[in-house]
Amino acid sequence: MKFNSGALFEKLRGGAGEGNTLNIALYVGLAIFIVLALANFLLSATTANKAQENITRASEMRVISQQIAKNALEAAAGNADAFELLDKSQKGFQSAWNAVKDEQVSDPEAMARLQTLWDEVNANADVILKGEDTVLDLHEVADTLAQTIPSLQAEYEGVVEILVTTDAAPEQIAFAQRQSWLAERIVRSIAKVLEGGDGAVIAADSFGRDASLFGRIMNGMIEGDAAMGIDQVNDPDALDYLAEIADLFDEFVNQSVDEILETAPELFQVRNAADTIFRRSQDLLEESTNLNNQFENTTSGLFPSVWLGGVSAGLAVLFFFIIMAQRNRQAAKLKDELESENQRNQAAILRLLDELGDLADGDLTVQATVTEDFTGAIADSINYSIDQLRNLVQTINNSAVQVASAAQETQSTAMHLAEASEHQAQEIAGASAAVNEMAVSIDQVSANAAESAAVAERAVAIANKGAEVVQATIHGMDTIREQIQETSKRIKRLGESSQEIGDIVSLINDIADQTNILALNAAIQASMAGEAGRGFAVVADEVQRLAERSAAATKQIETLVKTIQTDTNEAVISMEATTAEVVKGARLAQDAGVALEEIESVSKTLADLIQNISNAARQQAASAGHISNTMNVIQEITSQTSAGTTATARSIGNLAEMAQDMRNSVAGFRLPEHS
């Protein structure tokens, strides 16, 4: 059979051209899918990392929003450390907000609302930080006054004791007692000023007026003040007490009045700013939570991209096997055509096969010899195919290495994200436990406050009963005073009656003297009459003896009357002194009633304050419970994120194994060292 080398050569060229076109298309598709897979995996990893950072920032904003509210209230209450914590929290929130405010979210209006809320909270935080020196100085002054006022009260108690002991005027005793009440009112007014609220302005005005009145009364007791009706204290010991009181008042109280009144408006601004932050912190927490949820929803769109990358990698592997199958089909077709063409080509083919024997073992370093016979075209085509196969194997090796490297990096990143998510879940669990403990503590505070409120209410009832007892005592002392006055009047009338008896006794004494004189004259006349006047002399002697006995009796009566008058005068003086003491006791009892009314008022105020503390503690406990539930939800979401990241890492690990399998599939081919 004659061999047509020209026809065979043209057929081979046509078949090779068609195969090259198909191979190029397959190579292009393989390269496209490999690049697409790598780009998709890198983009997914970058996007996931950015989304996780946004979620972390939003979570930080949620926590810091509550820290700002807590630190603002503590700073306004005079806690020096709270100002530093507030400044740190403010900067932390601003930093987190700057990092996420330009991110794209599904609800842009939420970002605008959050910006508005933060601007308001940030401005009020600046007000608090600006007033740090004023608040701390004012609380320091208040603490100094709180330590000084008890000393003033103790000194005035000494003054009152001395005045009572020395029987001073009741008005002086009342003024001295009033000073202790004024000192107590000054302390309460300062406390109300520091607490802020609606009554703070009134408390500041009351503080100024009470401090001024305290100073005027103090100076009046030392020097006297006719306008206020205060007499100067003369007792040296009492004056020593008053001098010490004046030194304390001038050193601590008087110098602090103007400072407190001048800085009180700025303190009110700080308190209002803290209250505003506390009210808006819940809205800030809700908007931060909304932002966190939007960022978490954004991460859910990453997983289709990951699967798209896996599909692209699978298609790349499929294209590789299609190329190999195409090559095998071309080789088989060429072999069939050669065998069917002519058996005479067997020798040339065997020679060519001998040269290419190592190619069957995967040795791509062989090179077929191109001769002038018909095997030359075959050798040339085989050499071309070997070159293409070399390029293909080299491309597969390089692509597999790149895919494996990218998969390892992506897997490392995913595992790092999984570890970070697990660590975040642990931290959230710890925070949730701490919040639960805080809720238990707040419940205990609420229970203690409720019990204190009950005790304060009992104190109010006791003070009320004490006031009633004092009123009854005053009424009884008034009755005693009236009875003593009535008795004094009767004793005075008895003295006047005894005076009249004395006058009558004097008259009787005069009559007795005159009778005695008449009897003496009668006796003289009887003796002059001689025997005829003897009987008349006996009568005259008897009359004289009766007159002498009457005179002696009248002297005894006169002595008794004088004794009665003396006792009556002493009784009148004693009754008047008793009446004065009763009046003084009534005034002291009335002052005690006023003091009990003050105690009742203070106890009511204390009960209201304790009730407010209890209500606030219950509200804080409810907020802490809500935070704990929220933290549990965050922990569950973080656990799900960690599980998803771990699953992604396993999928990427499978991709790396597929790349290794692809390298193993071409490991049997031997390439030239220079390539």
From Swiss-Prot:
Sequence ranges assigned to domain Methyl-accepting transducer in this UniProt record: 399-635
Keywords, alphabetical: Membrane, Transducer, Transmembrane, Transmembrane helix
Localization per record: Membrane
SMART domains associated with the record: MA (SM00283)
Annotated InterPro entries: Chemotax_Me-accpt_rcpt (IPR004090), HAMP_dom (IPR003660), MCPsignal_dom (IPR004089), NarX-like_N (IPR029095)
Membrane topology: Multi-pass membrane protein
Biochemical pathway: Hydrocarbon metabolism; alkane degradation
GO biological process, one term: alkane catabolic process
Stretches assigned to the HAMP domain: 343-394
Function: Chemotactic-signal transducers respond to changes in the concentration of attractants and repellents in the environment, transduce a signal from the outside to the inside of the cell, and facilitate sensory adaptation through the variation of the level of methylation.
Descriptive protein name: Putative methyl-accepting chemotaxis AlkN
Naturally occurring in which organism (per UniProt): Alcanivorax borkumensis (strain ATCC 700651 / DSM 11573 / NCIMB 13689 / SK2)
